[in-house]
A protein has these predicted regions:
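Charged, alpha-helix-forming regions
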Residues: 1-351
């Protein structure tokens, strides 16, 4: 993908007319005047739900993509999907893998260790009853084209493999530790040939992926992500997820080099000068929906500066969302208990 195309994607807000412009203004106003409710708070990981996935399908000669985070290197290898002669190795890419991983993190965090419609914490199993329902929960259109794209990206996501490497030196030795992480241990995908929207899936996450999504993910506002993903570029969204997660524990000014930023966010952008321009444009877009963000981009320096800022989602709103999730689990349990008391165990199980 050319730098010009990527840059246009960054600037593209997805507007096709007056109606979309009005919706966008209304969304910005809504973000400004109220905090997100429990349904609008999801959880993101700066790598696992964002930058690890390429913005577009890499060329056939690319074996893996990788991102570093301190001493850790995350590597993504494409999986094989399809049947018979249609089998092919492809990467999950674009916005849908990001939303799918964030949706999983939301379901896991909201379950709070209890079994729900979508999560069984004991077996670390995720259930998607239908693609239509999944699209609705992710705030996506219900049309057939969207449902087909989500289904395809879900299959690519579940087929890929992640590995995490840590290296170090000491006493004349080089040590490298590697953990191999297929996202799932087992998966069943049900395809409805007549209507893709009724397709679904059940899969068991690996312990490592489940734990990282449940413990290392940071809250974000889905109204913000909806705005940032309106265009074709995922860069504004990735920057937002990284920044709101970083601000949680930031107590002092933090310089971040342009080289580090390019490695993290510059996939498929060949010219660093173009990347800097696009990063600044994406950052300005993020600031529209994250007004408390304080990030400085000195004109003639080789770094940007993160100043301590509030997180995108206030702590109070997160606590309220967690309390609402606990109430929801309690209500499900009470309904099950009431059903047992009224109808007996056998009938309650079938409900």
């Amino acid at each position: 993908m050319s730098d010009m195309r990527v840059e246009q994607d960054v600037l593209d807000l997805g507007s096709t007319g007056m109606e979309l412009d009005v919706r966008r203004v209304n969304l910005l106003d809504d973000i400004e005047v109220r905090e997100p409710n429990s349904m609008e708070i999801w959880y993101g990981h700066s790598i696992l739900t964002a930058t690890l996935f390429p913005p577009a399908q890499p060329s056939d000669d690319v074996d893996f993509v990788s991102k570093t985070n301190g001493r850790l290197e995350y590597m993504l290898e494409a999986g094989v999907t399809g049947d018979g002669d249609d089998r092919k190795r492809r990467f999950p890419f674009g916005k849908y893998p990001r939303l799918l991983m964030a949706w999983m993190a939301k379901q896991i965090r909201a379950a709070k260790g209890h079994r729900t419609r979508n999560v069984d914490p004991e077996t670390k199993t995720i259930t998607i009853p239908s693609i239509y329902q999944l699209c609705e929960e992710m705030g996506l259109p219900h049309g057939g084209r969207t449902a087909k794209s989500v289904q395809e990206q879900l299959e690519l996501l579940l087929a890929c493999r992640i590995s995490i490497r840590a290296s170090g030196t000491g006493k004349g030795l080089n040590v490298r530790d590697t953990a191999y992480l297929p996202i799932v241990q087992a998966v069943r995908i049900i395809n409805d040939e007549k209507n893709v929207g009724y397709s679904g899936a059940t899969f068991r996450l690996t312990d490592e992926v489940y734990e990282r999504l449940s413990r290392e993910s940071a809250p974000f506002d889905t109204r913000v992500s909806t705005y940032l993903l309106k265009g074709r570029s995922v860069m504004p969204y990735d920057i937002y997820i990284w920044l709101t997660g970083s601000m949680k524990n930031l107590r002092h000014d933090l310089p971040v080099s342009w080289d580090w930023l390019y490695e993290r966010f510059g996939d498929q952008i060949a010219v660093k000068k173009s990347f800097r321009r696009m990063f600044r444009q994406s950052l300005e877009k993020v600031k529209k929906v994250y007004p408390g963000l304080n990030v400085e981009c000195p004109t003639y320096e080789d770094y940007i500066i993160l100043h301590p800022s509030p997180t995108s989602v206030p702590t109070r709103a997160v606590h309220d969302a967690e309390a609402a999730a606990t109430d929801g689990v309690f209500n499900v349990a009470m309904r099950s208990l009431t059903s047992v008391q009224r109808n007996g165990v056998r009938k309650a199980i079938t409900e």
